[in-house]
Amino acid sequence: KYPPLKDKFKKYGDSFELVSKNESNRMYCYRRTTPEGIVYFEVFRSNLEKDDNGNVYESYPRSSQFGDTAWCIRDGENAMKKVLKYMQKTFSN
């Protein structure tokens, strides 16, 4: 089972914090900060999962989804433009 999305969490020693979400296309943006203070933005379309009771919830993408429905953008001059572009992406399903 994959855990449901949370506003803040830690994984691999990095801190993740929800920056924004687009309800219409299930796109999320999280700020990922390494212990050294390097900032990335992870933009992705959430996965739909079912819990043991059959309730649907959203989860973080798998590593294999990066480059397809998820992207990691290092903070910098054009980071926000890229984040906005991906946040508005449309999907056929």
Predicted regions and their residues:
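Short N-terminal "domain-start" leader segments
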Residues: 1-58
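Residue-identity detector for threonine
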Residues: 33-34, 69, 90
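Functionally constrained cores in energy, signaling, and assembly domains
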Residues: 46, 79, 91
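A short, exposed loop/beta-hairpin motif centered on an aromatic-Gly-Thr core
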Residues: 61-78
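Short arginine-rich
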Residues: 85-93
